[in-house]
Amino acid sequence: EVQLQESGPSLVKPSQTLSLTCSVTGDSITSDYWNWIRKFPGNKLEHMGYISYSGSTYYNPSLKSRISITRDTSKNQYYLQLNSVTSEDTATYYCTSLRFAYWGQGTLVTVSA
């Protein structure tokens, strides 16, 4: 069974960098595509980007100047970094597998001073 688990801070100050980790068990991150998704208050979903089995990345153009997705294959983890956050980045952040078959439980991140 594939399981994903997000971890990271629940509160980030404006202008700071948000860093999240997704730990994957039951599958290798070198054999699939791995997404970051966020759900805003009101339940609007946004696909932020992905990292592929080879390590190549895709970023949502609306975030491209602020986002980075990286990985550590030795830990079977991948990471989200979002720079210069504002209150509009307050959301529940999810890591998911290709075609969204498997989701983490999500982690709520609030951007506030």
Curated annotation (Swiss-Prot):
Q: A Gene Ontology MF term for this entry?
A: antigen binding
Q: Which GO terms describe its biological process?
A: immunoglobulin mediated immune response
Q: Disulfide connectivity?
A: none
Domain of life from the UniProt record: Eukaryota
Record organism? Mus musculus
Q: Pull one GO CC term from this UniProt entry.
A: extracellular region
Key word Transcription present in the record? no
Q: What is this protein called?
A: Ig heavy chain V region 36-60
**Which Gene3D superfamilies is this protein grouped with?**
Immunoglobulins (2.60.40.10)
